[in-house]
Amino acid sequence: MAVFVYAENINGIYKKAAFEAVSYAKAVAGQLGETVTAISVNPTDSSDLLYKYGADKVINIKDEGLKNFSAKAYAKAVNEVADGNILVFPHTTDASSVAPMLASMKHYSLRTNVLEAPESITPFQVKRRAFSGKGFMHAKADASGVIVTVSQNAFGVKENPASGTEEVKNLTIENEDTKVLSHEQSSGKLDLKEAEVVVSAGRGMKGPENWGMIEDLAATLGAATACSKPVSDIGWRPHSEHVGQTGKAIAPNLYIAVGISG
């Protein structure tokens, strides 16, 4: 039976996290001798992007009612088409809220923040982050039904081209739990979750007027900017840049901290 993977898109566009999740699913499928089926909701990007990383089949869910994200509604939609025993999700903010709801619907085990391909399939055992990223855990699950979320920038994006096929699935999922009053889309900035280099700063900068040097350094390095919790709390920087235990969990290859204690 195919290994299923949720290929998350943002406004129809696939991001690095989706390619990493497909790469991971391909590794799992390789251990099982199975194929990979990717699922996406209302994508506009070509399925060729997913074939490149190993998807043998792509199921595109089309549903006008799912234009606005709702974890519960998206979980219902994925549940309609995913009939495999192993499902892979990226560990993004949205996808990691869909995964537990889907696990509850299917009565599957859930293993989050996974770092590497399974150490074994029977039993299903993976290495995952624990204790706010300060340690690791080797967690087992029943391979007859398990969902994993793949920690970003951990497994990596690996090309493994497949001659894929595409299927369009038209659904009508009730999405009455969510009412969007407004939507603000940031533009022109790197996604902190996907950035390989991050420059972060704290109260040691003395004030928001001194942030120009941080932004200049980030621009020079091709990095994303981040900040500490106190800085976002007092309004020097937007809350979307807050990283750490109480903010966004990130995993860049290079992290530069300026004026941050601890």
Where are these regions (language model features)?
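N-terminal glycine-rich FAD/FM-binding segment characteristic of electron-transfer flavoproteins
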Residues: M1-G262
